[in-house]
Amino acid sequence: MVTIRLSRGGSKKRPFYHLNVADSRRARDGRYIERLGFFNPVARGQEERLRIDLDRVNHWVSQGAQLSDRAAQLVKDASKNA
């Protein structure tokens, strides 16, 4: 099954997440099919906190991809702000 989920990047105590489309059997930070955006939970000042390509998310969902719980919340936030 294909899922849309977060993969962790960044350094210790400074997380940074990419929103990826990946096979559910792959490791969290492993190989992915497509990168759809990012989420920076510790953004400060003028730094961008969230960027998601909603057209591509809708495309993958129409193809049968499942959103993880946190990814679904972030997509909802992004669509509200867009």
From Swiss-Prot:
Highest taxon, organism lineage: Bacteria
Presence of keyword Cell inner membrane: no
A GO molecular-function descriptor: structural constituent of ribosome
Stored Gene3D superfamilies: 3.30.1320.10
GO biological process, one term: translation
Cellular component annotations (GO), alphabetically ordered: cytoplasm; small ribosomal subunit
InterPro entries reported for this sequence: Ribosomal_bS16 (IPR000307), Ribosomal_bS16_dom_sf (IPR023803)
Alphabetically ordered keywords of this record: Ribonucleoprotein, Ribosomal protein
Residue spans crossing the bilayer: none
Disulfide links within the chain: none
Similarity comment: Belongs to the bacterial ribosomal protein bS16 family.
Protein name in the entry: Small ribosomal subunit protein bS16
Gene this protein is translated from: rpsP
